[in-house]
């Protein structure tokens, strides 16, 4: 039973992090390149790679 719960948690985490991974993998030169990738999330261009920050509920 524990195994199934762990599996469900891992699946949920994987599904929620896909857009973030996509954003991290996107190559960029400027912040504007990251805007369309990160959309609602704040993004920054670091070492030529987009990094998206997930907005907290606050």
UniProtKB/Swiss-Prot annotation:
The site (Binds trypsin) lies at 55
Instruction: List all disulphide bridges recorded for this chain.
Output: 28-45, 34-50, 38-52
**Protein keywords:** Amidation, Disulfide bond, Knottin, Protease inhibitor, Secreted, Serine protease inhibitor, Signal
Query: Listed GO molecular functions?
Result: serine-type endopeptidase inhibitor activity
Chief subcellular location equals secreted
Pull one GO CC term from this UniProt entry: extracellular region
Task: Name the reported effect of residue 44 to A.
Answer: No change in trypsin inhibition. At very high concentrations (20 uM), small decrease in hKv1.1/KCNA1 inhibition
Instruction: Give the comment on domains.
Output: Has the structural arrangement of an alpha-helix connected to antiparallel beta-sheets by disulfide bonds (CS-alpha/beta).
Q: What is this protein called?
A: Cyclotide trypsin inhibitor TopI1
Q: Which organism does this sequence originate in?
A: Tityus obscurus (Amazonian scorpion)
